[in-house]
Design a protein with these regions (language model features):
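Conserved GNAT acetyl-CoA-binding A-motif
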Residues: 132-142
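Conserved beta-strand-loop-alpha-helix junction that forms the acyl-donor binding cleft
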Residues: 140-150, 167-170
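Acetyl-CoA-dependent GNAT
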Residues: 30, 52-112, 129, 183-185
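Conserved acetyl-CoA-binding loop-helix of GNAT-fold acetyltransferases
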Residues: 108, 115-129, 150-155
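Conserved acetyl-CoA-binding loop of GNAT-fold acetyltransferases
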Residues: 154-164
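A short, well-structured alpha-helix characteristic of acyl/acetyltransferase catalytic modules
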Residues: 1-62, 186-195
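Solvent-exposed beta-strand sheet faces enriched in polar/charged residues
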Residues: 79, 93, 140-142, 161
Length: 195
């Protein structure tokens, strides 16, 4: 367990909340949908995501329900531990415990809350959950080329696997994405072996 990070489990033993030094990542609920809608309506929040501009509340609701019902998907809301303010969202997809998972979407919505280490703490919490709790061997993510979050991913030890050309469509425009990954031995070497 990383210092300052804790898991909280439900009666079935599943992790429903992760605490970091400054944040709580908790399973998303229907009460979060209006925040997701507001955040994902903001062009700055969705700049580097394949989220269509001007999506309706109904579309956000349908996506939430679909992902909540999908056993290969886990959705977290990122909350300031001190103030209780909702800060952002993290979504896992393609989860096959013991093998692989994708960080499908992660963001801190309000630009005034960026640059405070919240993204790093959120990523570390997810990495710990993925490798130590879910027992995954592979974690991967992709991002639009030019996304400034690439610096964070590099600093955490992710490896560049290549560019997927014209892989995502947003508002009718095709975008290249860069594929990054981390394997369990790499995570262990960086975060569990005293380094």
């Amino acid at each position: 367990m990383l210092k300052g990070y804790s898991f909280f489990r439900d009666e079935a033993g599943e992790v429903w909340k992760i605490e970091t030094p400054d944040l709580i990542l908790r399973l998303s609920t229907a009460d979060d949908i209006s925040d997701f809608y507001k955040w994902e309506y903001n062009t700055e929040t969705i700049r580097y995501f394949s989220i269509c501009e001007n999506q309706s509340m109904e579309e956000v609701w349908r996506d939430f329900v679909h992902r909540t019902e999908d056993p290969s998907s886990v959705n977290f809301t990122i909350v300031n531990k001190t103030t209780g303010e909702k800060l952002g969202r993290a979504m896992l997809a393609d989860l096959i415990r013991g093998w692989k998972v994708e960080i499908f979407r992660i963001y801190i919505a309000d630009t005034s809350n960026r640059g405070r280490g919240y993204g790093k703490q959120s990523m570390l919490a997810l990495m710990q959950l993925i490798f130590e709790e879910y027992g995954c061997e592979r974690l991967y993510l992709d991002h639009y080329t030019g996304n400034p979050a690439r610096k964070l991913y590099d600093s955490l030890g992710f490896h560049f696997e290549g560019t997927l050309r014209a892989n995502c469509r947003k508002n009718g425009v095709l975008h290249d994405v860069e594929l990054l990954s981390m394997l369990k031995p790499e995570y262990s070497s960086l975060y569990l072996n005293g380094k």
